């Protein structure tokens, strides 16, 4: 099992839209808005690291997503 925590910066005014799209992605077990350096935290669970990479690529393709940082545990 592989777990990921994706920390996301989002363009101004886009947090709600981005969060709704992220929550629909298969493999995302939770996603929520936060305060501080990042705007959204996403928790992901997959069977393989390659699946985690595909999910993070999908997140990065969402309009309004800026910088991301992914933490991985397997």
State where each predicted segment sits.
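A compositional/biophysical signature of low hydrophobicity enriched in polar/charged and small residues
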Residues: 1-74
